[in-house]
Design a protein with these regions (language model features):
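ATP-binding/phosphotransfer module of carbohydrate and carboxylate kinases, centering on a glycine-rich
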Residues: 22-187
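A short, charged helix-loop
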Residues: 4-31
């Protein structure tokens, strides 16, 4: 296994549906930026942004999550609390929260499929980070796998790439310690 450091989240977000274009335009205006990167969507903060956008639509004005957000408005760890709550409600059958989670998951799958092609991850793609361990069951879902492999002529190649999730949230620290130990041995 070779670990490749990446700032792949800074790749430009590529909306694929009318709904995703609407989200992209809302984010562009809301964040006052010219370019929306995948990190703005495919992250814990991104899941919160998708929820904020979706809850701003008229059909969601009276959703119970509106009250929950107002109660937490000044919480220090809002970017951690909201994604967990969105996923919990989605798993409990909340249709709107499920829609929000699916938009996020589709974008995540599409981005990882692009990265798998770009880096030729033929031996497998390992996902780590803050959101990955919390959503690992979703990386086996039909929605994720469809978005991951929907890559035109390279669809069959991407379908053959195994996707794994590193569940240890301290994986990066462990890896850094191993690298430091290796460098010390050389000195």
């Amino acid at each position: 296994i070779q670990v490749l450091a990446s700032e792949g989240g800074h790749i430009e977000y590529s909306p694929k549906s009318e709904l995703e274009w609407e989200l992209n335009n809302w984010l562009t205006n809301s964040l006052n930026v010219n370019l929306i990167t995948c990190e703005r969507i495919v992250s814990g903060a991104g899941l919160s942004r998708i929820a904020e956008w979706r809850l701003s639509k008229s059909d969601a004005k009276n959703h119970p999550f509106q009250k929950y957000i107002k109660e937490l408005k000044f919480a220090n760890d809002l970017e951690k609390i909201l994604p967990e709550k969105i996923c919990k409600l989605s798993n409990e059958g909340d249709i709107l929260m499920n829609e929000i989670e699916n938009i996020w998951l589709g974008a995540y799958g599409s981005l990882l499929g692009d990265i798998a092609i770009h880096e030729l991850c033929l031996g497998g793609l390992w996902i780590s980070g803050g959101t990955a361990p919390k959503h690992f069951k979703n990386f086996k879902s039909d929605l994720f796998l469809k978005q991951f492999s929907d890559k035109g002529r390279l669809k069959d190649m991407v379908k053959s790439i195994p996707v794994k999730v590193i569940l240890d949230e301290n994986f990066g620290l462990f890896s850094a310690a191993c690298r430091a130990k290796m460098l010390l041995r050389r000195a």
